[in-house]
């Protein structure tokens, strides 16, 4: 059965790559993380992505992530606004976690390419994504490819995207482009139909929206969520102040990037969030 992705089911706009809270023994602090996700949605962002780079996703076990998903349901977190990082060097782990997310009602999986062995061919990367899709065999699955070459050292080529879209047009839903090259984002917006492009930084939020992209998935949205929301609302309503709102948001991003410095976004943003909330528990990183 050839089912197309319905426009109304996609998560578009301002999405935050959520931080993950940990307890003193480094175990996952499920309640604090979910509460933070609810706070983000209260800032009127459009979606929350758990267990990405900023969420220290690769430091968590599949068991921990599955338990977290179970708690999202128990705590009535809106799953239609949820995306889960499920990528792994292990195809079996990626399939197990994506399957659990799907059966729980979360359709969008953010999938990193296998990243430990460098310089894989497009053929090898195609085989990885293809294997996940075929093993899951679920028409509801929406894979958002994660392009972050500075960290993974595995870039996602346009040829690979084209081939995946040709063979899995109803499953390869989009890409989070954290490469920092806005021309690459705009090129994908132009060249790939029915393919949602998310800027990996709110700096490129408006240009991507104007090119027909889906929006942004941003780490600093943990702090700038409200202003990200304002930009998207202004864009949708054709507010003439949208450029000024974007400029303000870009300035915030630059300040936060500088403030986080060499410690990186995860620990740096946690320090800022801890200070803002007067909550030392947010200082804990894995």
Give residue ranges: language-model regions.
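Active-site beta->alpha loop and helix N-cap motifs at the rims of alpha/beta catalytic domains
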Residues: 2-153
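Generic structural "secondary-structure junction" signal
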Residues: 21-24, 62, 118, 158, ...
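A general structural signal for well-ordered alpha-helical segments in protein cores
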Residues: 33, 65, 69, 94, ...
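Alpha-helix boundary/capping detector
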Residues: 66, 98, 127, 191, ...
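Catalytic alpha/beta core domains of metabolic enzymes, predominantly
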Residues: 135-141, 148-253, 257-261
């Amino acid at each position: 059965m050839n089912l197309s992705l319905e426009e109304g089911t996609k998560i578009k706009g301002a999405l935050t790559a959520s931080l993950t809270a940990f307890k003193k023994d480094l175990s996952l602090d499920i309640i604090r993380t979910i509460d933070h996700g609810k706070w983000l949605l209260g800032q009127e962002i459009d979606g929350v992505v758990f267990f990405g780079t900023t969420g220290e996703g690769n430091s968590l076990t599949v068991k921990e992530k599955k338990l977290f998903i179970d708690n999202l349901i128990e705590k009535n977190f809106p799953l239609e606004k949820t995306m889960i990082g499920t990528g792994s060097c292990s195809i079996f782990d990626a399939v197990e976690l994506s399957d659990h997310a799907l059966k729980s009602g979360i359709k969008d999986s953010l999938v990193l390419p296998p990243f430990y062995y460098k310089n894989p061919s497009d053929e090898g990367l195609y085989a990885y994504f293809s294997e996940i899709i075929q093993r899951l065999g679920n028409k509801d699955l929406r894979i958002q490819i994660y392009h972050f070459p500075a960290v993974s050292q595995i870039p996602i080529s346009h040829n690979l995207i084209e081939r995946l879209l040709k063979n899995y047009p109803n499953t390869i839903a989009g890409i989070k482009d954290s490469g920092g090259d806005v021309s690459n984002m705009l090129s994908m917006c132009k060249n790939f139909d029915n393919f949602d492009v998310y800027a990996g930084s709110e700096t490129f939020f408006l240009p991507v929206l104007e090119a027909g992209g889906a929006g942004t998935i941003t780490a600093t949205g943990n702090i700038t969520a409200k202003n990200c929301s304002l930009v998207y609302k202004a864009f949708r309503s054709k507010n003439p102040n949208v450029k000024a709102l974007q400029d303000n948001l870009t300035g915030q991003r630059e300040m936060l990037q500088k403030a986080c410095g060499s410690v990186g976004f995860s620990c740096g943003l946690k320090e800022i969030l801890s200070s803002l909330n007067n909550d030392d528990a947010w200082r804990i990183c894995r």
